[in-house]
Amino acid sequence: MSATISDLDRLLVAIAAIPTPWKEWPGGYPGRLDLALVDAVMSIRFRYGRERKDGSWTGARGAVLRYQAYSDHVAPAEKMKNLANQDPIALERILNRQKVHSGKTKACAIVEAAQRFLAIDVTEPAHLRPDDAEHRAQYTGVSGLGPVTWEYFTMLLSHDGVKADTWIRRFVERSVQRNVSSDEAGALIKEAANKLDVRETKLDYAVWNYASTTRLETMPKLS
């Protein structure tokens, strides 16, 4: 359902206050389905990370780069099969021991998702279709993985979208001055992107970067 005019107008006013030029979306992994999957899962409730003086990275970015180096020797056509065949416990030592919920590590969720995609012959970025219900179900069918990170997974493969995470939702809530769900926040950002004639991914990243760096200190709190 379309947002009300008042909500969309308020959101557009808030977006107009974001300093320009907007921070550019850093891009994802258009040629690496395995890295997109690792990033999507490792980013759940985890900071993106920052570069250390030695060139290594902390956070989710660091985990992805470690796995990239670890799997560098694998032939491109075998990347997803290699990920699906990983021992989750061994993979934890490369990534980290964070969990998607109390009973499952992120490494375990990554391997399970890779196995599910492998079972339906989705092994390369070109095979994945964001609007395919079966493809979505293979991802969200893994306990701990949901629709928000599914959309982020597809964004990392160069498909347009919005990852309606905590910062996106909070920005929208502050803009419209009421509580909203992740689904509603994502829909509003998409409507705003359409109104502004920009890619959804571009607006998503601009809002996320602004919200996460300013902690929304200049925006009015919910009354």
Region roles according to the model:
Residues 1-100:
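Structure-specific DNA junction-binding interface
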Residues 67-142:
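Alpha-helical ds-nucleic-acid-binding substructure associated with the helix-hairpin-helix region
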Residues 1-31, 35, 105-115, 125-223:
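C-terminal accessory module of base-excision DNA glycosylases/AP lyases that mediates lesion recognition
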Residues 42-50, 72, 118, 161, ...:
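Short alpha-helix boundary/capping elements
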